Amino acid sequence: MANELQPLSLLFQNRLFLIPDYQRGYAWLQQQLVDFWDDLVNLQADRYHYTGLLSLKPLKCKETVSWGEDLWLVENGYKPCHIVDGQQRITTFVILLNEIVGFVRGLNENKGKSDKEITLGYETVEEIVSKYICRKRPPNGVVTTYLFGYEVDNPSAEYMKYKVFDEPYSGAVNETYYTKNLKFAKNFFAENIRKLYEESGEGGLEAVNTLYKKLTQRLMFNLHEIDDDYDVFVAFETMNNRGKKLTNLELLKNRLIYLTTLYDDEVFDEKDKSALRKKINDTWKEVYYQLGRNKSVPLSDDDFLRAHWIIYFRYSRKRGDDYIKFLLSKFSSKGIFEKAPVLVETEAESVISDDVTDADDTEVTETEEQEIIEVSKLQPKEIEDYVNSLKAVSYTHLRAHETE
């Protein structure tokens, strides 16, 4: 287990960062961005700034088999990691770094130059991009692998690649509440870098160089690598409720995905677990899409969850957070580990007497056996039914608000 202070220039050495599916999307708003920017700009060039905890879960080979064309970096010694805690800060860092690179590329003195010819903080832009943003697989460079991103079924994955990193040929890219935050952060940093450059007069380029060096060398993370036997779902729920708290919708998603991992393989095998997990992810993708369709006035997560709770569980109470207390109690590990007896009837067996000599006189008797087995009180089907209902109601919830 690693537990040490490191700047981002070391953190990004031979690592691939991925935000897992149980994580929320990018949740920082203007106030968090202003605080981050002010801390960085006001940091003295010879001082360090403690940025907080970064908890990583190293991934095993079997957890990366679906990465396809991106596996080449793993095969070349890169260490794939899930970000359990600290993803908001790392995402912010990557967005800001990308905007610094884009700004320097666009300066008049760099027009027509390749990334090999443009320097920033004693490094070429080509070196910076390959260290912090993406690598192209040699020799042809057809495959581009990003060093930071989201699970592929997360709408933010495509948005990050095409709208934040500006990779061309995106086609249609879905937008959500979280991608709106990514867009805001990108524009926020682009504008502030431009202002910093202009307000610094003749020292504008040096000011941007200093910003880059402070960003990569002076922001210190407390790196913590989580052991294999550590419960990352519980860790995520605990850690991410300390700073900008998880919404109830985010908390519930993490809880349901966590529960899918607890069933015995004999009852619910890996393919079933993967299918249910995908169904949960697809449902949350649809829910966030419906709630965020009106980008200027997105619908409330809490109002939606409460409304669905009343419909699905036929509750009429509307006091405070009754609904989330009920849901987190209903969908808990206790419901899986506690067993309930179930009576199972086996098929009847036909028994033919050995004494029979005439086929017409064959005496057939049937014996029935009954067996009691222990099963989890909370069955996978119950989770699936709830998730399906949540997805269906998200659309009608939107329609109801449109007609108000």
Segments from the language model and where they lie:
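Flexible coil/loop and intrinsically disordered segments
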Residues: 1-402
